[in-house]
């Protein structure tokens, strides 16, 4: 049985899910022993620990120039001391170009089968990847398992499904028969989906697998070789993924350099040299807007970016203010505000928020939000696991600097005790108050656990400001609370014009931070927060070109 035959059913279900946009998950998100095996968690933790202080030798990339690695656990604030093979840019690109000549000629069914097999093997590494993610990013255990494991794999499957379908859109061959009166002109025509070439995927430090895997699999399914360039602070999770892809390639007598890992250090980064190489044709990037905009400006490259944005919450009217504040407190606290979809700017009318019991004043809304944050943080069974740890020292410095920005401090950021990791780098959410006239205080992303409560004249001004921020600075998510159908429609319409998806009236166990593969488009590509979207047709069709040949038909 071919790998395509082995996995074709899940591919068919994934393609169906792309169109239905209802719930679909091929990889169970709960780390249950009943699903993954009684010893899966312990085995994964042991596998992770066995890598510490050693060379990562699972890759099939021979003859490195050296071995480098500088990852540090945000929980232990100690180096992992894992060393990865490093290569020159010319070597990486040359190896990729050589692999391209073989990979592009592999049929789409076989490509899909190989990539689906890789995902099935990656599934067996979910727990090892989870611990690797925890100790490079600072994510809590559950998020690390879900985001880097099943949720990332579902996004990869989504890219495979989208690419596979687009590559089937047109026939490979057709006979063109044009009547000309007493005779016909007949041409035999063929069409080829031609991959663009070497693809570079640039990872980030907070979601090294989830944010990168869609680009990796999107390029591979469309016939392009991939060079995965992770952030120097978060290599291990995606290194495991690349190793599994290489293993499947080698098992099927294909060049493992079809997917390579390209590591560097903060003091000797290779990213610019790599992306500026004339043979690099495709670039996927997650990170800051300055570097993302530079990548978008490079001539002759097809670039897919997710950059920074200013995410808003519009508070107009609610049924239950306490449930709303509990939901928003969790959204703010989740992974200490280090998600690209985390809320930052909360627009609240100066008169307050309407409820069935009457108006809740601005100050009372602020107090309730602060109380909910404190209640979550101080809950030893929830706080440490929800907040996790802070990935970068720069983020903790940004939190300290935020107190000096000139806004009123409603709730100070503080540390807390993590019972499992006494030396964890932690910070609780900070709440600042600003008037709507002080745009300089809230017109940029403040990455980390920082939120601003902005006092507006009314909901119309709240909507206008949220739209302005999205159009000018980008936005990936928006939350809105209103019980008024007309207000809801106005928010939906105005934010749609700013290419920003809105989550309305969320309470309970669903949050504006979250996106579901096969249903939610992650980033729209329509505002400055990024030019691409997980996973619409354009995300894969821009990775190849349709080319047609024709000749007289043989009668």
List each language-model region with its residue ranges.
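Rossmann-like NAD(P) dinucleotide-binding subdomain of oxidoreductase/dehydrogenase enzymes
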Residues: 167-325
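Short, structured beta/alpha segment
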Residues: 1-135, 456, 462-464, 469
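Residue-level signal for inorganic ion chemistry
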Residues: 111, 223, 259, 283, ...
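Long amphipathic alpha-helix in the N-terminal Rossmann-like dinucleotide-binding domain
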Residues: 46, 90-94, 102, 112-127, ...
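C-terminal segments
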Residues: 1-63, 92, 144, 148-171, ...
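Short, flexible/disordered intra-domain loops and linkers
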Residues: 237, 353-364
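Short, well-ordered beta-strand elements within core beta-sheets of diverse protein domains
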Residues: 79-84, 96-105, 181, 314-315, ...
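Short helix-loop capping/hinge motifs at secondary-structure junctions, enriched
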Residues: 320-324, 352-358, 437-441
